[in-house]
Amino acid sequence: MSIAALVLVAAINNPAIDMDGYLRVAAEAAAYRQSHRLTEDEFLRMSHEPGTIVLDARSSEKFALLHVKGAVNLSFPDISIATLAELLPDKNARILIYCNNNFKNEETAFPGKAARASLNLSTYIALYSYGYHNVYELGPLLDAHATKLPLEGSLLLASDQQQSRSVREP
């Protein structure tokens, strides 16, 4: 690398952004994550256990449309020291996560993302970076219309209302 390039790199240094540190934590989290992926049945069982938090890091708009019943929403861009301390004060609490890429056949609420850009990956690494290591991830790709996981949201309400109208209409 030339002296000019080194000077340029030094000139744009930002101590609040640490790519090397991120990559180290991502590699550590990736190894840890392998033993923290759950089947649909495991996720369902664990979600009902006391002290377990189901976290949905999608946008509040997508969350309102459809989410796992009982989940709390913290949109990924809003994850910070302050928001985590408020929502998840116990870093040892069991946290279950899921994302768009866990559900198919409901693109409005769960639009698919590139596999390498899955929100589960970003969320897992972010939580791990903040010291939350008791995090479990829903593993499989599930049909949103056939999953065992209870879902709730405005899409279901609209669907129920539509079905009620069609049953009453001759």
Tell me the role of every PLM-derived stretch.
Residues 50-55, 91-94:
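Short coil/turn segments at beta-strand junctions that form active-site/ligand-binding loops
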Residues 58-59, 101:
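Short glycine-rich, polar/acidic loop-and-turn segments at beta strand-coil junctions
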Residues 53-58, 71-74:
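Short hydrophobic beta-strand that contains or immediately precedes a catalytic carboxylate
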Residues 45, 62-65:
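Short, solvent-exposed loop/turn elements at domain surfaces
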Residues 41-50:
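A short acidic-Thr-Gly-centered motif at the start of a beta-strand
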Residues 1-37, 64-74, 79-170:
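Rhodanese-like catalytic fold shared by cysteine-dependent sulfurtransferases
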Residues 42, 58, 122:
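Short Gly/charged-rich anion-binding patches and loops
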